[in-house]
Amino acid sequence: MNISRLSAILLASTAVPVMAMDDVQSTGSTVAIANDAIEDTAQDTPSREIIVTAERIRGSVDTDVPPVEQLNEADIASLGASSLTDIVAAVAPQANSGRGRGGGMPIILLNGQRVSGFRELRDLPPEAIRQVQIFPEEVALKYGFRPDQRVINFILKDNFGSFATEFERAEPQDGGFARNEFETTLTRISKNTRFNLDIKLEQSTALTESERDLISSGGSVLARGGNISGLGVNGTISPALNALAGSNVTKAGVPLGVSSPNLAQFASTANRLNDSNIGDARTLLPRTERLEVNGTWSKAFGPQTILSLNANYALTGNESLLGLPGTSFVLPGSSPFSPFGQDVTLSRYFDTPRPLKRDSETHVFQTGSTFNHALGGWRWTVTGNYARNANDTQTTRNADFTALRAGVLAGTTNPFAADFGANLLFLAPDLASSLNQNMDLRSTLAGTALKLPTGDVQLTFASGFTRQMLDSETWRSGVTTDISLRRNNMNHSVNAELPLTGRDFGLGAVIGEWSVNGNIGYSDLSDFGTLMEYGAGLRWAPARNLTFQASITGDENAPGIGQLGNPNLVTPNVATYDFTRGESLFINVITGGNPALIGEKRRDLILNANWNPDFIKDFALQFSYFKNN
């Protein structure tokens, strides 16, 4: 499928000036400023160039690629965010990428360095952030990532401390649902140490269909009181009932509150069914409880070495209502409780023993570490992660109607009695459990391989190993299905950035800055074979405030191990609209993995243009074109 997207985005940005002057040029740690004021006031004086030595903001990304957006402390405060998660959500229009498969999380950096994962810093308060930088996809290559996501760099303040407790309660205007959240966060940041601990407790009540006035009949003839359907010629319930009603009666609601209804009472409900709505026994939102603890510790061992550790645990419980147990019986004409004189069908729901439901409990434990070390002009980063996700799900199946059906057929059980079905028991529930474990270790080496008059040749080498383990077991109707999948992924990639011309050297003073980049990598999957990835890009900056970029990327992707082997779950009584028949139905929906899935190949073409006009303050214009195959 070919998808072409053309977008022109107006972005408001805030610059951090080095000096209160108009034209600023940054190369490495040198800022060159043309003194226009001298030229204006003294035309006979030869123009002079003032060289001001300055340092980059500590923690900024060392790249010549201009950021898409920068936020200072005032900009961050204006977002009204309470965590870094809120900030990422607020800058999503600038941070999301149109490349690749879309929908992925931007790459997150902290002080210009890789982290083990977003959870390492997501609970930091926004007040601890000095600046936020958003970079285009090309910068991802510098850190060993694919160029299909943009990069967000959070720059921390050198010294910060806080202890915050937050309570939130949310209720919709129409009621019926409430969500409570309690969170406490401790943060300590110094020049060489960072500590953050966050504890969060969330509770939410269930929201049923009836609380939103939804009718969930699903085209069913089942009803709490019961409905009668005919089995005779032309679907007739009873010729005698036809005579009383004056028409052919094919369906009739059971008179409510009557233990021995007669034909005259059924005539009052002729060709009218009892209400089959069971919205009070079906949830739109489940009842949920969640406890999460997240902690991070980081320390700089000297100016060139940083170690970070993170641990996270989350417990989540859900309870969903899936409707009422129900079935259809054949009520024989010979039954002493039947007034019809011939066989009919009785269809009804039962409030006892209780609604069908699904209970789910999930335990998630994650830990990660990051080691950053400078080796001369090179930066070596090692990240490691382990995640364990254990889930247990129990789904109530329908009730066991065997004894009840036998009693109705034998004529010993009154199907219209108030206590009909009071002693029902559920069939054995469906059980599903899964244990998903992921381990990964990745090493990245990035630095300057060669210094040229036009600029530095940058190389990035990345190697990684990932092991995924999925074990699942499903028990349904007495049949047990076990799935055990393993996947090892050894991957390597290299990226090179080569400056062709420099603005202050040779031809570059006339035609501007030109640079090219390229990357190639492969992954060897134990259960899927070898997958390749590649990319190349061209960058042209004819002026300091105008940049054009063109790039092509391609890769091969395998289905996730969960997509192949997740346990199958059957969810009963899911309201579904049949477009062919034009009616709503209750159906059983099966979800889970499919071991027959095949791989995917993708190719992207990307064109970008960025312009920051000098005559409009805090204004940027970005043009992007994507073509995805």
Which ranges hold each PLM region?
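Extracytoplasmic beta-strand/coil segments of soluble accessory domains associated
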Residues: T27-G28, D36, D40, T53, ...
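N-terminal periplasmic "start-of-domain" segments of outer-membrane beta-barrel proteins
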Residues: V24, P46-L79, G104-L109, F163
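Non-catalytic regulatory/gating segments with a bias toward low-complexity or hydrophobic composition
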Residues: I76, V88, V132-Q133, I152-F154, ...
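Surface-exposed, low-complexity loop segments enriched in small/polar and acidic residues
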Residues: I108, L207, E211-L222, V254-T288, ...
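Outer-membrane beta-barrel proteins
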Residues: L156-D158, E171, T184-N192, T296-P303, ...
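Transmembrane beta-barrel strands of outer-membrane/channel proteins
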Residues: T165-E171, F182-T184, L197-Q203, L309-L315, ...
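A beta-strand signature from Gram-negative outer-membrane beta-barrel systems
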Residues: V115, L124-E166, T208
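Short strand-turn segments of transmembrane beta-barrel domains in outer membranes
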Residues: Q133, V151, F160-T187, L197, ...
